[in-house]
């Protein structure tokens, strides 16, 4: 038998969702400032949602010269606790630990990865370990965890790499459909901090435009929050 109180709570929750979504006009184009304000006012979840961006690019990633990929250091961070693994030779393990790495080792970490144990968000490696790491490339690659010199995760500068990963470094990569998706901070951040992150990310993606690309590069852009509304950005408002 249904509890009347439970039914009332469900109806109340549904009403809140409807009211929140009604605050966002689906046919309206927003600039970044107004978009952030609208998403905050339309959020109804009880946890701290992530501000997410989706960018549709006029590229074909199947062509090697149209790959768009890189990393961005977000000025205000991501709001997430990032677990960092460092794979290096024994003589550099203490340096990695002192720099704040959560997991440090060499072949022992590689063996854990082979067994399916992956308890880190970022994997950093020194160049002399890459041959050994190649044995788990098929595991780490699809998860976006394979160390890559272009992303700063294959490096001799362990300390700085850990600092970047911990402070809010976000990787982006265009999917087969030409779409880039990333989380750029928590909705509880100040509007100013969210806008700093947004501008830094958008600027980086625009700078990554393939030199030989013909036609329009940035096709569409949307902002949303976790389990929340989505708004379309007016591309003419992007400097």
UniProtKB/Swiss-Prot annotation:
Gene3D superfamilies: 3.30.190.20, 3.40.50.790. GO terms for molecular function: rRNA binding; structural constituent of ribosome; tRNA binding. Keywords: Repressor, Ribonucleoprotein, Ribosomal protein, RNA-binding, rRNA-binding, Translation regulation, tRNA-binding. InterPro entries: Ribosom_uL1_bac-type, Ribosomal_uL1, Ribosomal_uL1-like, Ribosomal_uL1/biogenesis, Ribosomal_uL1_3-a/b-sand, Ribosomal_uL1_CS. GO terms for biological process: regulation of translation; translation. GO terms for cellular component: large ribosomal subunit. Binds directly to 23S rRNA. The L1 stalk is quite mobile in the ribosome, and is involved in E site tRNA release. It comes from the Bacteria. CDD domains: Ribosomal_L1. Belongs to the universal ribosomal protein uL1 family. PROSITE patterns: RIBOSOMAL_L1 (PS01199). Pfam families: Ribosomal_L1. Part of the 50S ribosomal subunit. SUPFAM superfamilies: Ribosomal protein L1. The keyword rRNA-binding applies. This is Large ribosomal subunit protein uL1. It comes from Rickettsia akari (strain Hartford).
């Amino acid at each position: 038998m249904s509890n009347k109180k439970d039914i009332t709570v469900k109806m109340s929750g549904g009403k809140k969702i409807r009211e929140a979504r009604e605050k966002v006009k689906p046919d309206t184009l927003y600039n970044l400032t107004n978009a952030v304000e609208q998403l905050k006012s339309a959020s109804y979840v009880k946890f701290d949602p992530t501000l997410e961006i989706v960018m549709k690019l006029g590229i074909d990633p199947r062509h090697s010269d149209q790959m768009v990929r890189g990393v961005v250091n977000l000025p205000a961070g991501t709001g997430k606790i990032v677990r960092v693994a460092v794979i290096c030779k024994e003589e550099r393990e203490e340096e990695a630990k002192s720099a704040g790495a959560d997991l440090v080792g060499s072949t022992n970490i590689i063996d854990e990865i082979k067994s399916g144990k992956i308890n880190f968000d970022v994997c950093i490696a020194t160049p002399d370990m890459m041959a050994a790491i190649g044995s788990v490339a098929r595991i780490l690659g699809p998860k976006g965890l394979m160390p890559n010199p272009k992303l700063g995760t294959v490096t001799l500068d362990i300390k700085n790499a850990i600092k970047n990963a911990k402070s809010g470094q976000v990787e982006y990569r265009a999917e087969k459909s030409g779409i880039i998706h990333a989380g750029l901070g928590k909705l509880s951040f100040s509007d100013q901090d969210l806008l700093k992150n947004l501008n830094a990310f958008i600027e980086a993606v625009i700078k990554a435009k393939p030199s030989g690309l013909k036609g329009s590069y940035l096709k569409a852009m949307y902002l949303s929050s976790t389990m929340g509304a989505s708004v379309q950005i007016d591309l003419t408002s992007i400097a």
